[in-house]
């Protein structure tokens, strides 16, 4: 068969399938299936965009094969589709093949009055893409010609138009709808126009960028209001708004995406004690977690995974978004307690001591906190070097009762309640605090001997009428004058207080220093 006459011009924005249907309507007035049989083209090959089928159609139509190939959606490797320079999955194609803009079809009829209607109606490529829901030229929503007909039983386009009652009836059914910002980005990307999505989107496929924008925007706008399952019920208008929101974020690059993840996490952080990734990041995490490992979602997965590891207490060996966690980055109060083999109360006191937790924080609020693993190394080191009360007494050169008194007065901060120390053999006191206490007292003290009017700390406490631990606290506060360091002694047994200072304090001590003994 030679070149068909009359020649039918190819519209660059229509699909190869649409052109073949128009060619059949012009030259035979019959069905596309019988027309393709006459040309020796298998319908399934043309639907799949097979190079041989497209080339044969271009040959008989007198078209440049490359021009027609640019309008064909081709199957690639069984998992992907290609269109022009874009690659995407079948999920990016609308399952409704018969979506049209009635106003565009009316324009087609008006422009080609000499052609039969079936030869003038052009099915636009953009109508096949899932994010496209409205016509930017006419400001109306796309109309589904056969919403109740399964895809496999879909009649040919001409028959669908007859079922719908023609173009005029379709125009009456169309509703005003402006295209969303994300749809306009898809149009520009597909047509090869300058990409204003920024470098973060520019490095992604059209599907990766569009899906990331939609889901990120949906979680930002509706994540707090919808349960995870109800996102399927979002309306077309809600998805349009979500896509626009996500696009604005994506245009700001990776930094803006991370800031959006901060917002999502902050909104959901109070919903549960130590909520996992699904509770914290909602739809965004669910979408990425259950996505096929063979379908790369693009850099949004990396950004979310890094955000999870930087903010949630994830155990080494756990799998997060398809990758095993090699090293812990964050600790929760619970996981840290388990690692240190302490109670959660002891751990919280340790975190307060190293400045990682504010004092007096309610237990529920404390359980929601997460701490950088490197930051809590100070606490880990303190626990590793901690000693028992008896060992602390030996290191300080005092009695166990005096160590307990120092804890009662707040001079030492144990890992367990000081009220329990007499009944426990647990590691309770960080050794570095003991050394720091002795060093501070030595720096404050002047050397003296027992004959210079100086009392040992225990005797000075009795004279001043305060417990031993409170006396040491008063010395550290400078309220008993300069202490003395008695020669030939070690540890706290060398601590001395001027007798005159103890007498003066006894006669004028404020009531708030009276501590029951």
Which positions does each model-derived feature cover?
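Intrinsically disordered, low-complexity regulatory/linker segments
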Residues: 1-517
């Amino acid at each position: 068969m030679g070149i068909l006459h009359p020649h039918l011009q190819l519209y660059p924005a229509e699909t190869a399938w649409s052109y073949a249907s128009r060619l059949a309507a012009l030259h035979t007035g019959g069905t596309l299936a019988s027309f393709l049989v006459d040309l020796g083209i298998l319908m399934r090959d043309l639907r799949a965009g097979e190079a041989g089928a497209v080339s044969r159609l271009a040959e008989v139509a007198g078209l440049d094969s490359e021009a027609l190939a640019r309008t064909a959606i081709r199957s690639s490797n069984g998992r992907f589709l290609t269109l022009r320079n874009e690659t995407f999955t079948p999920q990016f194609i609308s399952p409704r093949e018969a979506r049209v803009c009635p106003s565009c079809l009316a324009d087609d009829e008006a422009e080609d009055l000499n052609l039969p209607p079936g030869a003038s109606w052009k099915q636009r490529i953009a109508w096949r893409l899932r994010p496209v829901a409205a016509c930017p030229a006419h400001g109306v929503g796309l109309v589904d010609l056969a919403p109740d007909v399964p895809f496999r039983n879909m009649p040919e386009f001409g028959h669908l138009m007859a079922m719908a009652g023609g173009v005029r009836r379709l125009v009456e059914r169309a509703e005003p709808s402006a295209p969303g910002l994300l749809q306009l980005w898809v149009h520009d990307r597909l047509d090869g126009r300058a990409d204003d999505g920024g470098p973060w989107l520019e490095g992604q496929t059209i599907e990766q960028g569009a899906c990331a924008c939609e889901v990120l925007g949906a979680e930002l706008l509706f994540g707090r209001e919808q349960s995870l399952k109800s996102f399927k019920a979002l309306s077309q208008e809600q998805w349009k708004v979500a896509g626009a929101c996500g696009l604005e974020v994506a245009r700001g690059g990776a930094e803006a995406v991370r800031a959006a993840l901060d917002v999502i996490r902050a909104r959901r952080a109070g919903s549960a004690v130590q909520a996992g990734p699904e509770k914290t990041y909602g739809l965004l995490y669910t979408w990425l977690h259950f996505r096929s490992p063979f379908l790369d979602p693009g850099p949004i997965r990396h950004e979310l995974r890094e955000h999870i590891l930087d903010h949630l207490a994830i155990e080494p060996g756990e799998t997060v978004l398809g990758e095993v966690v090699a090293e812990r980055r964050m600790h929760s109060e619970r996981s840290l307690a388990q690692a240190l083999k302490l109670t959660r109360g002891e751990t919280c006191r340790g975190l307060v001591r190293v400045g990682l937790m504010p004092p007096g924080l309610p237990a529920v609020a404390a359980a929601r906190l997460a701490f950088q693993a490197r930051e809590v190394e100070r606490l880990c080191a303190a626990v590793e070097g901690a000693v028992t009360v008896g060992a602390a007494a030996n290191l300080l050169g005092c009695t166990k009762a005096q160590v307990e008194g120092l804890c009662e007065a707040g001079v030492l901060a144990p890992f367990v309640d000081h009220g329990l120390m007499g009944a426990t053999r647990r590691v309770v006191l960080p050794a570095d605090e003991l050394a720091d206490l002795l060093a501070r007292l030595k720096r404050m003290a002047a050397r003296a001997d027992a004959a210079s009017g100086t009392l040992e700390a225990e005797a000075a406490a009795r004279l001043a009428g305060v417990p031993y631990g409170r006396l040491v606290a008063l010395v550290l506060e400078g309220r008993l004058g300069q202490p003395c360091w008695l020669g030939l002694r070690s540890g706290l047994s060398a601590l001395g207080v001027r007798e005159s200072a103890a007498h003066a304090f006894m006669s004028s001590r404020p009531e708030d220093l009276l501590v029951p003994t």
